[in-house]
A protein has these predicted regions:
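Enzyme catalytic cores with a strong preference for nitrogen-chemistry domains
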Residues: 1-212
Length: 212
């Protein structure tokens, strides 16, 4: 339903968005064989899958391994001259319950390819509990300092049955909280990056050459 509404607004000038959603692989009878938790790029061309969640929590209220298939690939998302690492929710929380560490794997790839990320983006639907906000901020700061770039955390807001999602999305740069959304309310944050100047620099160089 949401995508139908978005498709109705789709046009060549629409902004590019990153959306969290599910990807289904069906059998011939229409029964899901695999369900993946995915980050999509959505723009005037439609939906493009970018990244599949690697860590599937299977504790407390979570039973994701029963329903979902895990991803195995890192994702470095390039957009208008900027590079971003992508993570989904649990991927930022390596623990003894998991055999892989998506943050470490992403870091190793950017080091190997000599890439300086402009940000690490995490799309989350993270339930609230007492002390969770402080724990998130500490972990976000660790990741930001590891990569030397802002950590952009976006969280679901609202309720589902007895589960509460507190929103409170934020941007952390090093040890500093630079942007903060409201708790338990829908909110919009605007975070500006330096514009990519490559195309303008090329045009300027060409103009200088023509006019010299």
């Amino acid at each position: 339903e949401l995508l139908d509404k978005l498709d109705a607004l789709r046009n060549p000038k629409m902004p590019t968005m990153l959306l969290g959603g599910l990807e289904y692989k069906m059998d011939q009878d229409g029964i899901p064989l695999k369900i993946r938790n995915v980050i999509y790029e959505y723009n005037s061309k439609g939906l493009t899958p970018l990244y599949t969640k690697k860590l599937l929590p299977n504790y407390d209220i979570f039973d994701e391994q029963k329903y979902f298939s895990a991803g195995s690939e890192n994702s470095i998302y390039n957009f208008q001259g900027k590079s971003f690492g992508l993570l989904i929710c649990e991927d930022m929380w390596m623990s003894s319950m998991h055999t892989t560490d998506p943050v470490k794997e992403l870091f190793e790839e950017v080091q190997e390819k000599n890439i300086q990320l402009d940000g690490v983006i995490n799309l989350s639907a993270s339930p609230f509990y007492l002390g969770k906000d402080k724990t998130r901020l500490i972990r976000a700061s660790e990741i930001s300092q590891l990569f030397g770039c802002p950590f952009i955390y976006t969280n679901r807001v609202g309720g589902e049955d007895e589960i509460l999602f507190d929103g409170s999305s934020f941007v952390v740069n090093g040890a500093q909280i630079t942007h903060r959304a409201k708790f338990y309310q829908e909110d919009v944050l605007s975070y500006q990056l330096e514009a990519f100047s490559g195309e303008l620099d090329q045009k300027k160089a060409l103009n200088d050459k023509v006019n010299s």
